[in-house]
Regions:
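Bacterial Sec-dependent N-terminal signal peptides
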Residues: 3-6, 11-43, 140-154, 260-267
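Extended, hydrophobic interaction surfaces within ordered domains
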Residues: 16, 55, 92-94, 98-147
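Tryptophan-anchored aromatic micro-motifs
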Residues: 32-50, 151-173, 208-209
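Fold-core signature of tandem repeat domains
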Residues: 36, 40-42, 58-60, 97, ...
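Beta-turn initiation residues at beta-strand->coil junctions
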Residues: 42-47, 68-74, 99-104, 126-131, ...
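N-terminal glycine/threonine-rich, aromatic-flanked beta-hairpin/loop signature
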Residues: 51-97, 172-224
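An anionic, turn-rich surface loop/hairpin at beta-sheet edges
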Residues: 98-115, 216-235
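Edge beta-strand at a domain terminus
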Residues: 129-161, 204-210, 247-267
């Protein structure tokens, strides 16, 4: 009888070990270390499309390193951040990806992605983010996110001077009377046509910055004596001297509206 009990116990232990091994193999079947490499943009949260100003681009250069690009000034609890390819540490454990970065000297951001599905073009995950400032948690959120792989990077193609040809949808800070020149150092110049039909540079700004990561374009500027302003766009295409932008905007009542701009390259 004692021998039978020992055999049964051994069977249970082996069975449990086999189940654990199978479960681990199932997680490893995701092959996150391989599939995650590349550039990804967050496009949906909890089943709804994200406005352009809420989007983030992650570039996984390896299974241990990534960069994060995002422009944040609409969430007072986490402060204002301008993250142009901010370095992040990455750990991957089965189907969990953890990113840790430091937007400034006092802030730490830890993101956990529990990946539920991944392909060569997109992945979905249960996402948790914890933001601490001076060791105090200032933000702790959980969402279901969808990320899409970004194959284009317009950070070089956007360089040069562009003239707006058309603006569709709602107007925010821009109208069709605009020329922009983007420089490799992350600054840009802005011109407007005066009443005489001549282009004049806008000179009342303390700074004008931008970054492009993949298809995400973020700008920020500050007029003398005024608050800093920001805007977000997604570059739909740049080809043959033509450039198209698109953006999903969210109104105060929660409704959304699409906006677009078309540009042509000029000398």
């Amino acid at each position: 009888m004692k021998k039978l009990i020992m055999v049964l116990a051994a069977t249970v232990i082996c069975g449990a070990s086999l189940f654990t091994s199978c479960k681990k193999d199932e997680d490893n079947d995701l092959k996150l270390e391989e599939k995650i490499i590349g550039k990804w943009m967050v496009t949906d949260m909890n089943g709804k499309p994200l406005p352009s100003n809420e989007k983030t681009v992650y570039t996984f250069v390896s299974a241990t390193k990534a960069t994060v690009s995002t422009s944040i000034n609409t969430h007072p609890e986490v402060g204002t951040h301008w993250n142009d390819r901010l370095d992040a540490d990455v750990t991957i454990d089965d189907n969990k990806i953890t990113l840790t970065d430091h937007p400034d000297e006092t802030t730490t951001v830890v993101e956990e992605y529990i990946v539920t599905d991944i392909s060569g073009t997109e992945f979905t995950a249960n996402h948790k983010v914890v933001v601490t400032k001076d060791g105090i948690v200032v933000d702790n959120d959980n969402h279901v996110l969808r990320l899409v792989k970004v194959t284009a990077d317009y950070s070089t193609a956007i360089l040069g001077k562009w003239e707006c040809q058309e603006l569709t949808g709602i107007e925010t800070f821009n109208d069709a009377n605009a020329r922009l020149e983007f420089f490799a150092d992350g600054t840009y110049n802005y011109w407007r046509k005066n009443d005489a039909g001549e282009w004049e540079a806008v000179t009342n700004r303390e700074f004008q910055n931008y970054f492009v990561d993949g298809t995400l374009l973020a700008t920020r500027w500050k007029n003398t004596g005024e608050d800093e302003l920001r805007e977000w766009w997604e570059i739909a295409s740049i080809a043959n001297g033509q450039m198209q932008w698109t953006a999903l905007r969210q109104n105060a009542d929660g409704t959304t509206a699409q906006q677009g701009m078309k540009w042509v390259k000029v000398n």
